[in-house]
From Swiss-Prot:
This is Dihydroorotate dehydrogenase (quinone). It comes from Burkholderia ambifaria (strain ATCC BAA-244 / DSM 16087 / CCUG 44356 / LMG 19182 / AMMD). Its cofactor is FMN. InterPro entries: Aldolase_TIM, DHO_dehydrogenase, Dihydroorotate_DH_1_2, Dihydroorotate_DH_2, Dihydroorotate_DH_cat, Dihydroorotate_DH_CS. It comes from the Bacteria. Belongs to the dihydroorotate dehydrogenase family. Type 2 subfamily. The gene is pyrD. SUPFAM superfamilies: FMN-linked oxidoreductases. The active site is at residue 178.
Length: 345
């Protein structure tokens, strides 16, 4: 039902400020989830089960983190046909993020620029929201560091968040690739990443012993990486036996949107312009890690064919964000069906 209504809703939403439209949509989905209206909105998406990280996904098309930073609309989002939901990024303490305006549409390029800056209500409220959700599918919880935490102490924030979210997560994503938190991408460097992942894997094992279950860790990386950086990241993932990698976050490049309104705004660019760069990172990373570290492909998916290309590049699962904002829930079903056809061809 919602899929057929979305084109009409989008016309109104796209007349609003991008962030205001974002919040309005989340409030509506949150209300739908709380009142049971989500059942009426439920999308008809075929099952296409896939097992990755030891988890069985209803279908391989998920929602990327960033849309629901506080986990406040999980049930409403789950009704739209996604095979898995990822919420966050959340930080130890609440923070407002960067000053507004901080989200911009580039409709001529099917793109967004955002410099949100991990705005969220903190991990304690996040956990309460997750616990209140009725959704029992695969739920990824995405964690980051507070803006005022020195980069040298970033591991403390990640370890704190990991401990808080661990009992409630199907998997936990370590976000070290947002361009909107100062110096965060330094953590992708070989030495910094090695130290961070060593600490996280040690904490993961201790939490697994405490809770009686091993919750997989996924690392989210940037598209703005050279070949040597991709190789180093791949080696580090293998060395620490990280369960998955999400490729990729937003890009700082503006090559594909030069001259367009808002193109010079600071922040990360997402949508169609990041598709090729994301696929290239996926291909190179897959060449390094093979099947030992599953890849979740995200960046610029606007059609079922785009999702298929991501899998052909080496991804095991895909996630939607900007394409979902532009095309709505119909994109979820289209991607699932395209992937299912590919597997039966």
């Amino acid at each position: 039902m919602f899929s057929s209504l979305y084109p009409l809703a989008r016309a109104s939403l796209f007349k609003m400020d991008a962030e205001d439209a974002h919040h309005l949509t989340l409030r509506a989905l949150g209300a739908a989830g709380r009142t049971g209206l989500a059942c009426a909105l439920s999308a008809r998406v075929p099952d296409a089960p896939r097992t990755v990280m030891g988890l069985t996904f209803r279908n391989p098309v998920g929602l990327a983190a960033g849309l629901d930073k506080d986990g406040a609309a999980i049930d409403g989002l789950a009704s739209l046909g996604f095979g898995f939901i990822e919420v966050g990024t959340v930080t130890p303490r609440p923070q407002p993020g960067n000053p507004r305006p901080r989200m911009f549409r580039l409709p001529q390029a099917d793109a967004l620029i955002n410099r949100m800056g991990f705005n969220n209500h903190g991990v304690d409220q996040f956990v309460k929201n997750v616990q209140a959700a009725r959704y029992r599918g695969i739920l990824g919880l995405n964690i980051g560091k507070n803006a005022d935490t020195p980069i040298e102490r970033a591991a403390e924030d990640y370890l704190y968040c990991l401990e808080r979210v661990y009992p409630f997560a199907s998997y936990v994503t370590i976000n070290i690739s947002s361009p909107n938190t100062k110096n965060l991408r330094q953590l992708q460097g070989a030495g910094e990443l090695d130290a961070l992942l060593a600490a996280l894997k040690d904490k993961q094992q201790r939490l697994a012993d405490l809770h009686g279950k091993l919750v997989p860790l996924a690392l989210k990386i940037a598209p703005d990486l050279d070949d040597e950086q991709v190789k180093e990241i791949g080696d580090t993932l293998l060395r620490h036996k990280i369960e998955a990698v999400i490729a990729t976050n937003t890009t700082l490049s503006r090559a594909a949107v030069q001259g367009l309104p808002h193109a010079d705004e600071a922040g990360g660019l997402s949508g169609r312009p990041v598709f090729d760069a994301s696929n290239e990172v996926i291909r190179k990373l897959h060449a390094e890690v093979g099947s030992a570290v599953p890849i979740i492909g995200v960046g610029g998916i606007f059609s079922g064919e785009d999702a298929r290309v991501k899998l052909a590049a080496g991804a095991s699962l895909v996630q939607l964000y900007t394409g979902f904002i532009y095309r709505g829930p119909a994109l979820v079903a289209e991607c699932v069906k395209a992937i299912a056809r590919e597997r039966t061809a």
